[in-house]
């Protein structure tokens, strides 16, 4: 079980690739026999951390995992898996504690997960523009945030202005 986002994977994969004990990886839990190893959490990402994440990769010849293994992504595969929409996440974290939601477990483990973290409006708009330039058939953008409408109003307002000016799809 992985309990935080993004930056911890580098450490995990380096240990795994070198054949070292990856069960010491921060922010992961592992089952060994009847025991559960609960490693401490890395700090949650900040807005600056999120602004510095590399963009999602959605262009021809980038790699995608399919049941048959890893293969180069092409436009046909992209449309097969995503349709005509670009799927992304701008923010993570949620102030709510809904019984049906998986975030509840994250909050129980670390109450700081309630705090919404997000990159800047400029960063998410640049990400969308890059995706559209790589996949010009895109006709919509779908956000899969934990709590999109809980973002600060000023950030949503700035995003709306940038989106309207620079993105030509709904």
Question: Where in the sequence are the language-model features?
Answer:
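Short catalytic/ligand-binding loop motif for oxyanion handling, primarily in non-cytosolic enzymes
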Residues: 8-11, 37-39, 46-48, 97, ...
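Glycine-rich beta-alpha loop elements in corrinoid/cobalamin-binding modules
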Residues: 1-47
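Conserved residues at the C-terminal ends of beta-strands
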Residues: 2-4, 31, 56, 104, ...
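A generic structural signal for well-ordered coil/turn residues at beta-strand boundaries
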Residues: 24, 49, 82-84
């Amino acid at each position: 079980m992985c309990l935080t986002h993004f930056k911890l994977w580098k450490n995990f994969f380096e240990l795994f690739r070198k054949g070292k004990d990856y069960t010491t990886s921060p922010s992961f839990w592992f089952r060994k026999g009847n025991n559960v190893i609960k490693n401490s959490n890395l700090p949650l990402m900040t807005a600056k951390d999120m602004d510095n994440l590399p963009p999602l990769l959605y262009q021809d010849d980038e790699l995608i995992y399919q049941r048959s293994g890893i293969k180069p992504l092409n436009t046909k595969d992209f449309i097969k898996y995503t349709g005509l929409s670009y799927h992304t996440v701008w923010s993570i974290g949620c102030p709510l504690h809904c019984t049906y939601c998986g975030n509840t477990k994250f909050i129980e483990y670390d109450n700081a997960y309630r705090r919404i973290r997000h990159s800047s409006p400029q960063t998410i708009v640049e990400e969308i523009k890059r995706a559209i330039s790589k996949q010009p058939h895109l006709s919509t953008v779908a956000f899969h945030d934990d709590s999109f409408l809980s973002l600060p109003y000023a950030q949503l307002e700035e995003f709306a202005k940038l989106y309207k000016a620079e993105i030509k799809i709904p």
